[in-house]
């Protein structure tokens, strides 16, 4: 059964993003009040704010967790044109703060000349890497060569997307058959510009990222984008949040059918398109197995989508902030840990501005 818990976040302005850690027991929120808050889940299921601090000198658009293999590490990005990496430090035995934790800024990434609109850590098999995207259309990929020293980050790649960028998503596949891949969404409002989702793939020969595909059917501003976790599939699934919810499959073509430059080409199909929110869709998030998608929109609901055995995607649940499910087909899906995604998305619904993220 779905239970909605209202959390008095105590942010002084709009909450733009909510992010859960790998285990789903820690949560980070960020806001236009320039702060980030960290929340821990107690044994009785209640969330308690354990840290709150001013992170930037402008609205904080996104916050995200690194894999716990690298410690308790957060990244944030802001209208102030920077991204920052934070690490939780627990007081040592000779410290007055023994056993107490606090968050320390390890680095500030200052390469962008415009608002940094999204930040995402790469899948852990790639090492400690971080991607940012900016309103000026540049995606930057950084690497921490020494995971024990988070103050040193080197800029590895700059990708010019030619369109203002609003969101990014790494392909989580760890298969050696799949090169590192990142999807970029644009919130450019011009209806004349098609292809507001671009896919970039790492080329081992050139050691650079090159554009593999453009989803020409996406012509409306994109607010969020998410590759599904890949548990042995030979193809990729990508969800896009725009004026509706869209789900694409990307099936790699055989190398001899791909371009001679070595970039993989894909057979792309729109397998689902839903306008049930009847409004802008702000967030899309997959469960851990990549079988259930949660979306949130300006209608104040979180909607859950799942494919049946015929690969037909259907809505299996509608969740409202007051905890009341709408419809009757939602039972049985919580075994796939959609609850955290739903809660994350509901918080995003409550705080995401409809004015976009380029201007404060």
Curated annotation (Swiss-Prot):
WD repeat ranges, renumbered to this chain: 10-49, 55-96, 111-152, 160-210, 217-258, 276-315
UniProt subcellular location: Chromosome, Centromere, Kinetochore; Nucleus, Nuclear pore complex; Lysosome membrane
Regulation acting on activity, per entry: The GATOR2 complex is negatively regulated by the upstream amino acid sensors CASTOR1 and SESN2, which sequester the GATOR2 complex in absence of amino acids. In the presence of abundant amino acids, GATOR2 is released from CASTOR1 and SESN2 and activated.
Gene Ontology process terms (BP): attachment of mitotic spindle microtubules to kinetochore; cell division; cellular response to amino acid starvation; cellular response to nutrient levels; mitotic metaphase chromosome alignment; mRNA transport; nuclear pore organization; positive regulation of TORC1 signaling
Keyword Transport: yes
Molecular function in Gene Ontology: structural molecule activity
Matches recorded under SUPFAM superfamilies: WD40 repeat-like (SSF50978)
Coiled-coil region: none
Entry GO CC: cytosol; GATOR2 complex; kinetochore; lysosomal membrane; nuclear pore outer ring; Seh1-associated complex
One family name in Pfam for this protein: WD40
Keywords, comma-separated and alphabetical: Cell cycle, Cell division, Centromere, Chromosome, Chromosome partition, Kinetochore, Lysosome, Membrane, Mitosis, mRNA transport, Nuclear pore complex, Nucleus, Protein transport, Repeat, Translocation, Transport, WD repeat
Record keyword Iron-sulfur present: no
Main function: Component of the Nup107-160 subcomplex of the nuclear pore complex (NPC). The Nup107-160 subcomplex is required for the assembly of a functional NPC. The Nup107-160 subcomplex is also required for normal kinetochore microtubule attachment, mitotic progression and chromosome segregation. This subunit plays a role in recruitment of the Nup107-160 subcomplex to the kinetochore. As a component of the GATOR2 complex, functions as an activator of the amino acid-sensing branch of the mTORC1 signaling pathway. The GATOR2 complex indirectly activates mTORC1 through the inhibition of the GATOR1 subcomplex. GATOR2 probably acts as an E3 ubiquitin-protein ligase toward GATOR1. In the presence of abundant amino acids, the GATOR2 complex mediates ubiquitination of the NPRL2 core component of the GATOR1 complex, leading to GATOR1 inactivation. In the absence of amino acids, GATOR2 is inhibited, activating the GATOR1 complex.
Similarity field: Belongs to the WD repeat SEC13 family.
Subunit composition and interactions: Component of the Nup107-160 subcomplex of the nuclear pore complex (NPC). The Nup107-160 subcomplex includes NUP160, NUP133, NUP107, NUP98, NUP85, NUP43, NUP37, SEH1 and SEC13. Component of the GATOR2 subcomplex, composed of MIOS, SEC13, SEH1L, WDR24 and WDR59. The GATOR2 complex interacts with CASTOR1 and CASTOR2; the interaction is negatively regulated by arginine. The GATOR2 complex interacts with SESN1, SESN2 and SESN3; the interaction is negatively regulated by amino acids.
Protein name: Nucleoporin SEH1-A
Source organism of the structure: Xenopus laevis (African clawed frog)
